Amino acid sequence: MNNPRSVSPLVSPANHSDLLENQRQSGSGDFSRLEKRIGARKMKFHSKSMPRGAMFLDQEASRNFHDKRYDLFRTMSGKLERQISNLRGKPTESSLQDHKEITESLTADRYFDALQGPELETLKEKEKIVLPEDKTWPFLLRFPITSYGMCLGVSSQAIMWKTLATTEAEKFLHVTQVINHVLWWISLLLLLAVSITYLFKTILFFEAVRREFRHPIRVNFFFAPLISILFLALGIPHSIISHLPSTLWYFLMAPILFLEMKIYGQWMSGGQRRLSKVANPTNHLSIVGNFAGALLGASMGLKEGPIFFFAIGLAYYLVLFVTLYQRLPTNETLPKELHPVFFLFVAAPAVASMAWTKISASFDLGSRLAYFISLFLYFSLVCRINLFRGFKFSLAWWAYTFPMTAVASATIKYSDEVTGVATKILSVVMSGAATLTVIAVLGLTVMHAFVQRDLFPNDVVIAISAEQPKQKRWFKHLTKESYGNNERCPKILDPEDNQIDLESPPLVNVDSSTVQNSN
């Protein structure tokens, strides 16, 4: 005899109605009691769908974060997973293949094949990435090294306002040093925030940082944190410290020197990372570090060290300037969306002008030559209004701020040497334009970061595959049949009786009249 008490309260919705029907047909007296029990209780069925509320979204985000494809970029999880698999004796082929795709060193040619644009950060159509394309990646994977451009823009403003407050020619403006003080602390906090975030990325996702360093364009931004520290040292208010120790200069310039030896050596090596192939306006960041270091060293009273770095910067700036202006076939034309990087042309000569002024203790001929070059490049870019229209906001817009501020600071130095109404007006206009640009770009950055939340999209640069997309079998077969066998390839004679192998494209079209005459 069936006991209704033996029925489990956890009954699936597919069979609880059948249970009631069987009890009804059997005429059991306990049917009403069973029906009341089932109807009165708010029973929880195993197949019941859970509500899609905030808790569900948190669980979904957690599952996305724990995607195994993200683990391949983690610093320790990939090694630990492989060790566990080896201990179990079951290393899966897919995991080994995914690990190979991540850890295999990417060549410069692979970046050029998979990406496009002046900064090589746009994925080509037929390329695939090793991370999910339809999901938002963890924030650290989306935080690029190019974020240090914000630090360059704000810290350079601290230098400019310090120069305005301490220059005799600009005393009529009555600029207080409080502005320099506030901007310096903002720059320091911003640099700490960006550095701590990128440090966590280095610790947790070292493979992503390694891929950025091997990127032929992104590698130039590894100079940005060092240059930002140099700018903080140059813009530090006198109320905080009046004289910096010279040992700080050696401590800051040592990593810049080692990084330059690697980058400049690759430019001259003639390999995949030769300058004629990777030349880009962002390469000016590696040049600016020399002039900024020379400016700081000369401000500290040093002599030989600043001249050494100034000479290196001058030599490589001339080489880079000529290479970029040549527009070699290996360099693609810059599209409209990333035109802000053009303003990096202005940064190096502007900082070089101020550096040589400190080295020579006067705004002499060398300083004026560098300043006039930067001023001409500045106005030649500003006059091209089309550069400022038709592209969306991104971190690349910060390329406007630092060069414009550098030219404004050099103009203030020039107005102090060549006094006059025109130079004073020019310095005020340049300083105002630089300040308004920084305010506008900073406001847009805050809006896109916290309101629209699209400032940091998925960074496809770090997720490209180490292998090129495989071609279709029929295409390979056609290519092999057409050009694979040299002996079966027909040969014809050109008018000079030279044999032309049809294997090598382009194919030669034979004139019909020539064929008739030969017949």
Swiss-Prot record:
InterPro entries with a match to the protein in the record: SLAC/SLAH, SLAC1/Mae1/Ssu1/TehA, Voltage-dep_anion_channel_sf
Pfam families: SLAC1
Positions on the Cytoplasmic side per record topology: 1-140, 207-220, 269-281, 326-340, 384-389, 446-519
Region (Disordered): 1-31, 495-519
Domain of life: Eukaryota
Family annotation (Gene3D superfamilies): Voltage-dependent anion channel (1.50.10.150)
Official protein name in the record: S-type anion channel SLAH2
Gene name per UniProt: SLAH2
